[in-house]
C-alpha cells in the first residue's frame, strides 16, 4: 500500500511527547516495507521541525541524528513537482496553505491515501474523497 505522508505525522515519530494512532499506523506500514510518497517540501518541513526541536531542547542532536538515520531507511520517495494550478485550486477551495494543498494534490494525483494529523487537511481530503490513513 502506497500512501502520502505529511510532515505532521513524520515529526510525531521524532518527539516522545507526541503520540498519535495515525502516526503509529503510518509507521507500522513503513516498517512492513510499504512505500510513502511526499512532496519535495516535506524534506524541508521535517528538517525545520527537528531543528526547532533541538533548539527548544525537545530532543538532542544525537537523537536528531538517529531520527534522520531511521527516516533514510524507510521507503519514502519524493514526488515530481505538481502543476501549480492544481495545488492552488485545492488551497483556494479548502482554505489551505499552499503547502498543505500540495499533500492533498499528491494524494489525488497518485490516487492513494493520505496520512496527516492536520485537521483542516484531513477535512479537505474527506471533501475530495481522498482516503485517510488510520481513519
Model-derived features: where do they sit?
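Acidic catalytic patch
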Residues: 40-43, 63-94
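Short, well-structured N-terminal submotif of metal-dependent ribonuclease cores
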Residues: 1-41, 53-65, 128
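Acidic, PIN/NYN-like endoribonuclease modules and their adjacent C-terminal/linker elements
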Residues: 2, 96, 104-135
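Short active-site oxyanion
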Residues: 1, 33-36, 76, 109-113
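Alpha-helix capping/helix-boundary segments
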Residues: 9, 42, 103, 120-121
Amino acid at each position: 500500500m502506497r500512501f502520502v505522508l505529511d510532515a505532521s505525522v513524520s515529526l510525531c515519530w521524532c518527539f516522545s511527547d507526541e503520540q498519535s494512532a495515525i502516526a503509529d499506523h503510518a509507521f507500522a506500514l513503513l516498517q512492513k516495507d510499504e512505500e510513502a510518497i511526499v512532496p519535495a517540501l516535506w524534506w524541508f518541513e521535517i528538517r525545520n521541525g527537528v531543528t526547532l526541536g533541538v533548539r527548544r531542547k525537545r530532543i538532542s542532536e544525537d537523537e536528531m541524528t538517529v531520527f534522520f538515520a531511521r527516516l533514510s531507511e524507510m521507503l519514502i520517495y519524493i514526488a515530481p513537482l505538481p502543476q501549480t494550478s492544481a495545488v492552488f485550486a485545492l488551497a483556494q477551495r479548502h482554505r489551505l496553505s499552499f503547502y498543505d494543498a500540495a499533500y492533498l494534490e499528491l494524494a489525488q494525483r497518485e490516487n492513494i491515501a493520505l496520512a496527516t494529523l492536520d485537521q483542516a487537511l484531513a477535512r479537505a481530503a474527506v471533501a475530495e474523497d481522498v482516503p485517510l490513513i488510520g481513519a
